[in-house]
């Protein structure tokens, strides 16, 4: 069971090594990187490549670790008891399985995605340590222990919004997805847009990386935003020549709303354009 990428996902050699090492060690794969570098999609593509079921747990700021195990609805049970509902005799009717429970009892070895773990509070990773390490947990309401028949392949993503605890990090295999270089990005583009004109890609990538390198950019455009921009360029029939011969005093590229998503960055480019016009007089 090895991951070699898929036809829809360009995986670097380092990323393939990281995925396969985590699988071999039976450790969670902790993936960090800029937003839009394919961290979440990685879990989806691992599941596709290995023909494994995918279970997704998208973490929010209000998410608690126990929700990944199960949730007990005591309020509904109390109400049903007052109404004389026969279901109250079996407490299992009021227990909702969480994503870890689903992964532990899956018929086939699944890929479990715990997405954006750093959005939750600082104690969230520590609260999952034992369950992820031992692959079991206890349900207090029923007195049963849920054990994983086979360890799921766990992929955990983080955008570095918070530092993760050392004890949690020790139990993971870590990989940082670097922002793609020009050659890798060209391969990604060709996967999404087969047959796209090479000259358009070349000019678009040149402009894209120039924008990312502008000092003071608050939000640099991501891979997904580049793909959106290229799609618009093709729909609007913007040629490679238009990108190459653009007025250097304008600076802001055509259809820039797909790339520049922050008003401060728009103002930055407007100031740079003003300075270029002033200096060119």
Give, region by region, the residue ranges found by the protein language model:
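C-terminal regulatory/interaction module of P-loop NTP-utilizing enzymes
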Residues: 1-281
